[in-house]
Amino acid sequence: MRCLSQGIFQEIFRTPIRRIGAFAGCALLAASCSNTGGTSPTGPSGPPPAGSTIVYTAVGASDATGYGSSVVCVPFFVDCPNGTGYVQVAVRALQSQGYKVTVRNMGEPTAVIGQDFQSLGQQYGRIIAFNFIDREMPFVLTNSTLVTIFAGGNDVNVITAALGGGAGGNDPLGFIDAQIRAFGADYTTLLSGIRNLAPSARVIVLNVPNMAGLPYMAGDSLQKRQAAQRAAVGMTTQVVNPLIGQGATIVDLMCDGRSYVPSNYSSDGMHPNDAGYAFMASELLRAITSSSYPSPQTSCGPMTVVPNP
């Protein structure tokens, strides 16, 4: 996977047309490897045997490319040995422990989980070029032994943008709750599709941190932060964390205090920097290699960084 400095990456994705064109070409490369597979309601669990081969597909948005870090990786290419995002740091750590790792990084900037969130975001002025279900799930490596999924951050931003544009009318809380349910339906489609394509893959999911507690929202109105909190906490507690009952391992970003340390974020206040991605990679590595990884917390202080309405 080819690596780019932060400045070069920003130049490539400076305009929507160039962003779409660059990644459309990458998607065509991925499409040349068609995927078929069987069905599996749940996936395997437990760590890979020491020294074994790990075939890893990372499903995500710009976070999977390491956007905000010092070395950002362009998706779909073969190798990114110096990348400083959580995917790349975790891969190097696995290799240092003797694992042989093959990676397909599906991370696409601006991506949301499904077409419904993509359309909603575009309706309210957000640039969203991709979604996980249509543009990432079909290209999961069928021989994957590990799939990681990190969805929700961009989706929360779609919800708050829609509310800011008048969506929800006199019932904004009802609108948020409806979007949480839609996110859950999309997650079911995404996870089912991944397991159909890659039935031997262990699935590790990173839950959604409370976006209201991230630096990029510090200057926003209380109402907007309350909406972001309701959406993020709902996505995590109602959609992502229950996936543990379907055999997924959950990395609990929501309740990890490191998710809210300002020094772990890049200048945009939303994407982690090298330090932030390093902590994410350390938790991902522990989830991959541990025979017993803790379940996500059902409640914690970070779920209420602002008072609920």
Where are these regions (language model features)?
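N-terminal secretory targeting modules
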Residues: 1-101, 142, 291-309
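Structural recognition of the beta-strand scaffold that forms the well-ordered cores
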Residues: 55-66, 102-107, 145-150, 155-158, ...
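Extracytoplasmic/secreted cell-surface and envelope-processing proteins
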Residues: 66-68, 115-116, 156-161, 213-216, ...
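Conserved SGNH/GDSL esterase-like catalytic core that processes O-acyl groups on lipids
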Residues: 68-185
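Solvent-exposed, polar/charged alpha-helical surfaces in well-ordered, non-transmembrane soluble domains
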Residues: 88, 92, 138, 158, ...
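A structural motif corresponding to the C-terminal end of an alpha-helix
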Residues: 91-99, 186-205, 234-252
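Active-site segments of SGNH/GDSL-like serine hydrolases
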Residues: 153-154, 163-164, 191-230
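Catalytic His-Asp segment of secreted/periplasmic serine-dependent ester chemistry enzymes
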Residues: 208-309
